[in-house]
């Protein structure tokens, strides 16, 4: 879609020099896609040390991540393997390979998505807009906070973590380090984000059907069961 105009949810953030959120404002608008960036392309550009948009984005992402860790966030930096089929199509050989490491690019994407989801969770609570919230009301030892890369550490911490749940009441998400968290940034691949985006559009535009909390709660059982099945598949990945 490079060079095309696309509909978007724009969120303008006012941050101080430490990356602390002071104010934000969501709006529906059209944006022109200037370029289709890739993780590898972003990683390579940051590695050059050139001062520019991506360099500043990386610096902000670092501040956002550190602030979350101060709120006891637990970050699992796991490898991202890919399965490659080789040889005879009728009887292929399956090979598991590691994707090229792109930690800076992935940090930018994850931290900016989390910032947006936290902000829209707060917006939903402040405006009385019914939305689906991802919550995890657990208490972890203080030493669990931080970024973990070793498989043994990740396994140990995950075993002490309770699962996150989807609900209609805004509550904390412990391992993300958020007081409220409403997923909105992946409406093309997560049904919860799709529903939340529809709620945002209805509230901001005054058009379309705006569901109340009771109507959303009636969808929760189906959504939660599907999310649990997806989670099982993700946990069993190589």
Could you say what each language-model-derived stretch is?
Residues 1-238:
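Electropositive polyanion-binding surfaces
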